[in-house]
Amino acid sequence: MLQSLNRSVRYLSTSIGSRLYCSNTNQTTKNNTNASGVNDNQQTHFGFKTVNKEDKESMVKDVFDSVSSSYDLMNDVMSMGIHRLWKDELINTLNPTPGSHLLDVAGGTGDISFRFLDKIKTSPNYFPNINKSNNGGGEVLKSSSLPSSATVFDINQSMLNEGKKRGLNKGYTDQSDPSIDWVQGNSEQLPFKDNTFNCYTVSFGIRNCTNIDQVLREAYRVLKPGGRFLCLEFSQVPNPLLRFAYDQYSFNVIPIMGQLISGDRDSYSYLVESIRKFPDQETFVQMIQDAGFKQVTYKNLTFGICSIHSGFKL
C-alpha cells in the first residue's frame, strides 16, 4: 500500500510541478510585531488557542515527538509530493557553492540539509576526498575544494534522531565530505558565535516558534556579513476562491490523514491552525527587515500556499 502511495505521490509531483511558480514580489509594508493577534506580552498562540509563552515550547515539542516517525510520509501525502519541489526551489534559490556553511534551523529530518549537500557535490568547483590504497592500508587525499558543511538545528531530539538515520543511509556524517552535524536547541537562543554561517534556512518551522522576532534577530547575529537568510513557509493564499478550497482541504482532510497515517489527528489539526496564524507575505517581509536584513524579497509558490522569503546581512 505504501509503495502504491509513493508512486501516486511521485506522479502528482511531476504532473503538477509545471504549475509550481506563480509570482515574484518585492514588498515593504507596515510593521506588525504581533502577527498572532495576541496582545498580552506573556501570551501567544498555539494554533487557534491562546496559551502562556512559557508553555508553548513544550506543547510544540509534544506535537513533533508524536509525528516524527511519520513526518516525511505525511508531508508527501498532505502536499501530494509538491513539498519536494518547494524544497528544491529553496536550494536552487540559495545556489550554494563549495565553502558554504549552512545553519538549517528547524531542520528536523534533514530534507533541506541533504539537498544543500547534494547541490554542493554537483558544483563544478567541488572535488571530493579520495581514498588511496597503500599496501592494504589507506590514506585520504584531501579535497582541493573548500570544505562545506550543514548544521541541522532543531528543538526536537526525536526529529533529529530520524534525520541522523537518513543521513547515515545517504553517507553524510560529521566526518564526510561535505559534512553534517546535528544540534538540539532553541532557535531563540542559538549556541553559535556571531558571524559563523554563510547561509541560514528555516523550512516549515518558524511559524511554530514562540517569539519569531527573536528568531530572526538570532538568524542575523550568526550569519556572516554577506550571508543569506531564506525561509520556506506556508503562507496566505490571496485568491478568495482558491483560499476557500484550500481551507476546506486543510481543515477537513489533513487531520483525517493524520489520524489514518500517524494515529494523531490533534497534532495535524494544530499544524493546520498554525499556518493560518502565521503572518501574511508582506507582513513577514517587514519583520525580516526589522531584524536588520536588507534586500528582503519573497516569491509565492503554488498560488501562495507557501512562499520563500529572502534577505541578506549587509
From Swiss-Prot:
PROSITE patterns: SAM_MT_UBIE, UBIE_1, UBIE_2. GO terms for molecular function: 2-methoxy-6-polyprenyl-1,4-benzoquinol methyltransferase activity. GO terms for cellular component: extrinsic component of mitochondrial inner membrane; mitochondrion. Pathway: Cofactor biosynthesis; ubiquinone biosynthesis. It catalyses: a 2-methoxy-6-(all-trans-polyprenyl)benzene-1,4-diol + S-adenosyl-L-methionine = a 5-methoxy-2-methyl-3-(all-trans-polyprenyl)benzene-1,4-diol + S-adenosyl-L-homocysteine + H(+). The keyword Methyltransferase applies. S-adenosyl-L-methionine binds at T109, D154, N186, S187, S203. Its EC number is 2.1.1.201. Keywords: Membrane, Methyltransferase, Mitochondrion, Mitochondrion inner membrane, S-adenosyl-L-methionine, Transferase, Transit peptide, Ubiquinone biosynthesis. It is a peripheral membrane protein. The keyword Membrane applies. It is found in: Mitochondrion inner membrane. Residues 1-19 form a transit peptide. InterPro entries: SAM-dependent_MTases_sf, UbiE/COQ5_MeTrFase, UbiE/COQ5_MeTrFase_CS. One of its GO terms (biological process) is methylation. Its main location: mitochondrion. Component of a multi-subunit COQ enzyme complex. Methyltransferase required for the conversion of 2-polyprenyl-6-methoxy-1,4-benzoquinol (DDMQH2) to 2-polyprenyl-3-methyl-6-methoxy-1,4-benzoquinol (DMQH2). Belongs to the class I-like SAM-binding methyltransferase superfamily. MenG/UbiE family. This is 2-methoxy-6-polyprenyl-1,4-benzoquinol methylase, mitochondrial. It comes from Dictyostelium discoideum (Social amoeba).
